[in-house]
């Protein structure tokens, strides 16, 4: 009796495994919200300064109003910060090329924003959809003060 139950259990397990649907992995596509199919261009529309989570000031920096930020969907995760005609610094490059990264676990988008630094910085993605994005970076050691940067998508390929 015991061997019959083992046999039936084995047959059921083989049948369950043999009849299961083939698993086809789908590629990770969440980052396409940043890049589109090939690339997506964003512009900054607003800065907010916060203190203890409350917005204390809203402003726009004139020299960044015509800058463009291009995220590419290639395997290198290429990124370009294209400076417009209004320069923030005398030695500001017309195009700053680098890489972008995104960590879903921490909602961190790492990229260069020349107004802050010539190096890539980690921004927390607060909200993002196909047309708008809001990122935040803290500027003090206690994480009580931050800048929130609002972007609008203006071109997608």
Model-predicted segments: where are they?
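N-terminal hydrophobic targeting signals that begin at the initiator methionine
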Residues: 1-2, 20
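Detector for intrinsically disordered, low-structure N-terminal pre-sequences
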Residues: 10-13, 32
């Amino acid at each position: 009796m015991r061997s019959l139950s083992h046999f039936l259990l084995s047959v059921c397990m083989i049948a369950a495994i043999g009849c299961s649907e083939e698993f086809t992995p789908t590629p990770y596509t969440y980052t396409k919200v940043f890049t589109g199919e090939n690339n997506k261009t964003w512009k900054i529309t607003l800065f907010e300064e916060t203190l203890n989570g409350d917005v204390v000031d809203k402003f726009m920096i004139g020299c960044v109003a015509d800058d463009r930020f291009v995220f590419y969907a290639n395997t290198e995760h290429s990124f370009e910060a294209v400076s417009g005609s209004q320069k923030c610094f005398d030695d500001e490059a017309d195009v700053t090329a680098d890489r972008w990264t995104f960590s879903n676990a921490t909602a961190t988008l790492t990229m260069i924003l020349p107004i802050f630094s010539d190096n890539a910085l980690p921004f927390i993605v607060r909200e993002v959809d196909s047309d708008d994005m809001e990122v935040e970076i803290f500027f003090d050691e206690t994480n009580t003060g931050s800048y929130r940067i609002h972007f609008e998508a203006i071109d997608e390929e």
